[in-house]
Amino acid sequence: VKSLIEYSNDLNVMVIPDMDFPSHSKAFLSLIKQNDKSLYQEIISDYSDNTLDFFSNRKAVDVTNRQIDEITELFKQPQFAEQQRIVLGGDEVAGGGAHQNSFIEYMNQIGDYAFQQGYEPQMWNDMVTHEGVKSLNNHYSILYWKQNEDNKSNLTVEDFDKYYFDVYNYNYYSLYFLPSKQFSQDDINEQAEYIGWAYAYNKFYYNKNPYNEVNSQNVKGSALSFWGEHATDMTQEELINQEVPLIKAYFNLKK
């Protein structure tokens, strides 16, 4: 990671660390379980073994903040002081919708801590309800991957704008790709062509239209995401051969 940061500094490129709390944390929690079973039992959620307990659990918050502290220090880039961002997660949280107050309280606590380290915290959109957004700390910016189908949490980009949240487009269709050995070069070329017509920085995934154009001042950018769950058996060369054509397609169109 240090070599990556040094290389990025030479190119004047800001690196955004991406973590995921309180859910999608099974690997992190497994390490804690191996080293301190007592602590593990105190911070594990009753809902899922990949989720930290977000119900006013001070120890769970402290453990999260220690991880944030380690990552923010590791990724620090002085030339981007007060501009750096960190993704803290907040997506697909078991119980997060039904217990929105506790979920938002947890996200506010860890977001405040990241902000104190000089980073802008970011979180995914899907677990925030129409009530929850009212108390979510504005330190956060929102990564919008798709509109939730639940009426309680189907906020649009415009809804987030009403509460002064900046939003980044992570469209679940046009800006997602999962590299895999099953894809041929023709498949990659087809995906690159798809990005060419489907992507625009303001085309968001809404339930009735995955390419819904949004004209709102709070749209601050977009990102192309690669997810690695199908790529564990791929070499670095194979990964690069699939990803680079899509990256080129994305940047050629980015405004």
Language-model segments: residues:
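C-terminal domain-boundary segment and adjacent tail
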Residues: 115, 120-122, 255
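Structural preference for beta-strand elements that scaffold enzyme active sites
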Residues: 12-16, 51, 83-87, 120-122, ...
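Alpha-helical scaffolding within the catalytic cores
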Residues: 33-34, 66-73, 127-129, 151-156, ...
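N-terminal active-site wall of soluble small-molecule enzyme domains
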Residues: 107-109, 131-135
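Active-site-proximal loop/turn and secondary-structure-junction residues that shape catalytic pockets
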Residues: 19-25, 92-94, 127-129, 146-148, ...
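Flexible, acidic glycine-rich loops studded with aromatic residues
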Residues: 133-255
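Substrate-binding cleft of carbohydrate-active enzyme catalytic domains
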Residues: 1-117
